[in-house]
Design a protein with these regions (language model features):
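Sec-dependent bacterial lipoprotein signal peptides
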Residues: 1-22
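N-terminal leader/targeting segments and the immediate start of mature chains
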Residues: 17-74, 242-253
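Extended lipid/amphipathic-ligand handling interfaces
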Residues: 37-42, 70-77, 97-103, 194-202, ...
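Short, hydrophobic/aromatic-rich segments at coil-to-beta transitions
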Residues: 47-51, 77-84, 153-160, 205-210
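Hydrophobic lipid-interacting interfaces of membrane-associated proteins
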Residues: 53-61, 87-91, 108-110, 214-218
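An acidic-aromatic
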Residues: 72-131
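Flexible, processing/modification-adjacent segments and terminal tails
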Residues: 108-176
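Gly/Pro-enriched, hydrophobic low-complexity segments
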Residues: 157-249
Length: 253
């Protein structure tokens, strides 16, 4: 009898423990499920703050040159508004736009200059901003979701692709924020690329994108380019575009 009761208690305890563990566990989504939810989250982003570092190392005739770029700021969609800072080597550029009306530009320590926001200017800035670039990738990611691995890291999921499929060169190009003409990439072949997109478990919103890639020049394989991109995203749908402190808007500016 004691044995039977002891066995029964053990079975009941095991059942309750199994239920408790099942209730506490979270199933890791497949890469397709994660990317579907991630791309849906992208569609709902109306404002955000971002910080992007780009490092390019070119090797030409065994000589290596390194270039560093940084672009950071806050952007709001519809109507387009932004406060963006760009640094390329020793050149600093600041851009401010509010309600798609006028664009203000400041280079290094010079004074702000006002430019009328033509439809062409708006189209150019709209296509080059981070939210537009992210949304450009939606169909591509959904179509190629099975190429990615997904793993849990704390409060996040990390989607990873590593390979050399040439179609990922387009993803690399669209991950450059704030850069206009990218036709120079047509002269290069993709040798390898690793993409790591970190997203929140709770909302599937972007946290950080890391890309490392190597390209070779089509007409001379000894010419190589190593590119590293790291972009973090925060303040999603909380970001507000504030007028720069040193910009005094008057009738003449």
């Amino acid at each position: 009898m004691k044995y039977t009761i002891k066995k029964l208690v053990f079975i009941i305890t095991t059942v309750f423990l199994s239920i408790a563990l099942a209730g506490c566990s979270t199933k890791t989504p497949t890469s397709q499920e994660a990317i579907d939810k991630y791309t849906e989250a992208l569609k709902n982003i109306k404002s955000e703050t971002y910080y992007s570092d780009v490092t390019v190392k070119d090797t030409i005739r065994n000589k290596e040159n390194t270039y560093k770029f940084n672009i950071n700021g806050t952007i709001v969609d519809n109507p387009l508004a932004m406060n963006v800072n760009i640094k390329i080597d020793d050149t600093a550029l600041s851009l401010y736009m509010k309600n798609s009306n006028s664009l203000y530009v400041k280079q290094n320590s010079l004074s702000w200059r006002k430019y009328k926001s033509s439809s062409e200017t708006l189209e150019r800035f709209d296509s080059a901003n981070k939210m537009s670039r992210d949304k450009e990738n939606i169909d591509f990611l959904k179509s190629n979701a099975n190429d990615f691995n997904v793993e849990e890291q704390g409060d996040n999921y990390v989607l990873t692709y590593s390979g050399s499929d040439t179609k990922y060169k387009d993803f690399l190009i669209s991950s450059f924020i704030g850069f206009g003409e990218m036709s120079e990439f047509n002269r290069y072949d993709l040798k390898n690329i690793t993409i790591k997109q970190t997203i929140k478990k709770s909302s599937f919103e972007p946290v950080e994108l890391n890309i490392t890639s190597e390209l070779t020049y089509k007409y001379d394989s000894s010419v190589k380019s190593y590119i590293e991109i790291k972009t973090t995203t925060s303040n999603i749908n909380l970001g507000k575009v504030a007028q720069p402190d040193d910009l005094k808007v008057t009738n003449n500016l």
